[in-house]
A protein has these predicted regions:
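Intrinsically disordered, low-complexity terminal regulatory regions
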Residues: 1-151, 164, 173-243
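Helix-to-coil/beta transition segments that act as allosteric "coupling" elements at the rims
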Residues: 157-171
Length: 247
């Protein structure tokens, strides 16, 4: 079953976890939920400093992004209606809907222009790579690493500079469980909504059941994840009657 990083980790626990990580390089057992602890440990293993930046993080040039979009044209074309649906459901909530490929490369984003400006400051924009190796614990990278939908809220992000975000992501898989990409909803952490995980998970799962091109998909035509997924997106479909609003 999908496993989110919820319930939300208390702020005091997160502060203590950061202190231990910086002072000792390790965390006491039970301080963080297991999925979050695993992601933070992976992030530390990549040599990332929680309070630092990410020098050397890859970012596609305009030409490279154009080639990636062409390479992933079927994924992009079929994801677009889902992204537009999520934008409509979350309008006025200071958020972005993001499509990434199976390596964490951000392909497209739609949503609030004001929030997009803030997101730019932490490279949450098309062309950037949000694999855990470069961004630490984050919904896109952690969903790829765990092969399951995740929520990463506020200070649960490994890098402190991403703490203003609340992000929900779900892998997009083919019928065999192979990850083709990630659908993500990112916004201001003050506007988190309790139904966001169900909405994003349902959107990714629904598209998995109806995209006619997936039987024709092959590894030679799309990027593949660096690790084997633990499972495909599961869960009952959610019928959304009203757009979500920030609290």
């Amino acid at each position: 079953m999908p496993q989110a990083l919820a319930p939300r980790t208390a702020a005091a626990q997160l502060r203590e976890a950061r202190r231990q990580l910086l002072d000792r390089g390790e965390l006491a057992p039970g301080l963080l939920p297991a999925p979050l602890l695993g992601s933070w440990r992976r992030s530390a293993g990549f040599g990332l400093a929680p309070s630092g930046r990410t020098p050397g993080a890859p970012h596609a040039s305009s030409a490279q992004l154009a080639r990636a979009l062409e390479h992933q044209r079927e994924l992009v074309a079929h994801a677009r209606p889902v992204m537009e649906f999520l934008v409509e459901q979350t309008r006025d909530s200071d958020s972005l809907v993001i499509l990434a490929d199976a390596q964490g490369l951000l392909l497209q984003s739609l949503g609030d222009a004001r929030f997009a400006d803030r997101a730019q400051r932490v490279a949450l924009r098309p062309g950037a790579t949000w694999h855990e190796q470069w961004r630490g614990t984050n919904a896109i990278g952690t969903a790829l690493a765990d092969g399951a939908p995740v929520v990463v809220h506020g200070a649960e992000h490994y890098l402190e500079r991403n703490g203003f975000l609340t992000c929900t992501a779900a892998p997009i898989t083919d019928p065999g469980g192979r990850v083709l990409g990630v659908l993500d909803l990112s916004g201001d952490q003050r506007g988190q909504h309790r139904h966001t995980l169900a909405l994003v998970r349902s959107a990714a799962r629904t598209r998995a059941s109806v995209w006619p091109w997936w039987p024709r998909w092959s590894p030679e035509r799309s990027s593949t994840p660096s690790t084997r997924p633990q499972g495909s997106v599961m869960g009952a479909a959610v019928q959304v009657r009203k757009p979500l609003r920030s609290r």
